Swiss-Prot record:
<keyword id="KW-0812">Transmembrane</keyword>
<keyword id="KW-0964">Secreted</keyword>
<protein>
    <recommendedName>
        <fullName>Type 3 secretion system translocon protein SctB</fullName>
    </recommendedName>
</protein>
<comment type="function">
    <text>Component of the type III secretion system (T3SS), also called injectisome, which is used to inject bacterial effector proteins into eukaryotic host cells. YopB/SctE and YopD/SctB are inserted into the host membrane where they form a pore and allow the translocation of effector proteins into the cytosol of target cells.</text>
</comment>
<comment type="function">
    <text>Involved in pathogenesis. Essential for the establishment of Yersinia infections in a mouse model system, but not for the targeting of effector Yops. May modulate the host's immune response at a distance from the site of infection.</text>
</comment>
<dbReference type="GO" id="GO:0016020">
    <property type="term" value="C:membrane"/>
</dbReference>
<dbReference type="InterPro" id="IPR008898">
    <property type="entry name" value="YopD-like"/>
</dbReference>
<feature type="transmembrane region" description="Helical">
    <location>
        <begin position="128"/>
        <end position="152"/>
    </location>
</feature>
<dbReference type="Pfam" id="PF05844">
    <property type="entry name" value="YopD"/>
</dbReference>
<dbReference type="GO" id="GO:0033644">
    <property type="term" value="C:host cell membrane"/>
</dbReference>
<comment type="similarity">
    <text>Belongs to the SctB/YopD family.</text>
</comment>
<keyword id="KW-0843">Virulence</keyword>
<comment type="subunit">
    <text>The core secretion machinery of the T3SS is composed of approximately 20 different proteins, including cytoplasmic components, a base, an export apparatus and a needle. This subunit is involved in the formation of a pore, called the translocon, in host membrane. Interacts with YopB/SctE and YopE. Together with YopB/SctE, forms a multimeric integral membrane complex with a mass of between 500 and 700 kDa. Interacts with its cognate chaperone SycD.</text>
</comment>
<dbReference type="GO" id="GO:0005576">
    <property type="term" value="C:extracellular region"/>
</dbReference>
<keyword id="KW-1133">Transmembrane helix</keyword>
<keyword id="KW-1043">Host membrane</keyword>
<keyword id="KW-0472">Membrane</keyword>
């Protein structure tokens, strides 16, 4: 399109479809001077680029149904409500996981405590066995010492009896020798009692001592037997008491072992609950992501946004 403009000064006029510019100048004598048409190259380039860009942009499909603002507000409210519920479920799962962590820590401590108590009871049982061995050793040593004293005393008594018996036998032999001598001399009127009257006090004294020693020997032997008879039940009672305590200790060990097993089982349950809560949290997050994505696609489709 070409526009001719008459004016006192040069005027340039453009339009949406202007492809040339004509300049006319009116002089003082009224003569119109026409200049050559000049083509607007920049405008032509811009117009070609605009037409090219319009040809590359796809045309959007116009929705066949208009947007209902009320339904849009309701949809937004439903989205917010659903997201609130899902977020609440996520928070509950997180709290449950925290409780599971605390429960697992508690069960770990309970397991460790039960194992420590079990070890302590086993150590106590070992100490009781050592105590039983010590008591048995003490009783055996006491009995041995008492027997040794008794034997030493009896040996001493036996030696004294041997000396006394030797003295008595020696005097009897002297009496017999004296009797033989007097019989050989023809003096048969002297009796054995008359000859033995000289050593009779020593004989009687030695015989009395011998009787006392024999009595003392029997008493010493009886005391040793009585002491052994008394110490053996005491040792047996001590061993029985230790065995009873050892039985209690073994029962405590079994109980602690059961408690440790229960604590380990509870720990496993807590770990399983934690795994379940983790999976539940992942599922909730996946649902939130899917729900938001679906709602976003729906809104884009409603507004015609690609």
């Amino acid at each position: 399109m070409t526009i001719n403009i008459k004016t006192d000064s040069p005027i340039i006029t453009t339009g949406s479809q202007l492809d040339a510019i004509t300049t006319e100048t009116v002089g003082q004598s009224g003569e119109v001077k026409k200049t050559e048409d000049t083509r607007h190259e920049a405008q032509a380039i811009k117009s070609s680029e605009a037409s090219l860009s319009r040809s590359q942009v796809p045309e959007l499909i116009k929705p066949s149904q208009g947007i209902n603002v009320a339904l849009l507000s309701k949809s937004q409210g439903d989205l917010n409500g659903t997201l609130s519920i899902l977020l609440l479920l996520l928070e509950l799962a997180r709290k449950a996981r925290e409780m599971g962590l605390q429960q697992r820590d508690i069960e770990n401590k309970a397991t460790i405590s039960a194992q420590k108590e079990q070890v302590a009871e086993m150590v106590s049982g070992a100490k009781l066995m050592i105590a039983m061995a010590v008591v048995s050793g003490i009783m055996a040593a006491t009995s041995t010492v008492a027997s040794a004293f008794s034997i030493a005393k009896e040996v001493k008594i036996v030696k004294q009896e041997q000396i006394l018996n030797s003295n008595i036998a020696g005097r009897d032999q002297l009496i017999d020798t004296k009797m033989q001598q007097m019989s050989n001399a023809g003096d048969k009127a002297v009796s054995r009692e008359d000859i033995g009257r000289i050593w009779k006090p020593e004989q009687v004294a030695d015989q009395n001592k011998l009787a006392l020693l024999d009595k003392e020997f029997r008493m010493t032997d009886s005391k040793a037997n009585a002491f052994n008879a008394a110490t053996q039940p005491l040792g047996q009672m001590a061993n029985s008491a230790i065995q009873v305590h050892q039985g209690y200790s073994q029962a405590e060990v079994k109980e602690k072992e059961v408690n440790a097993s229960i604590a380990a089982n509870e720990k496993q349950k807590a770990e399983e609950a934690m795994n379940y809560n983790d999976n539940f949290m992942k599922d909730v997050l996946r649902l939130i992501e899917q729900y938001v994505s679906s709602h976003t696609h729906a809104m884009k489709a409603a507004f015609g946004v690609v």
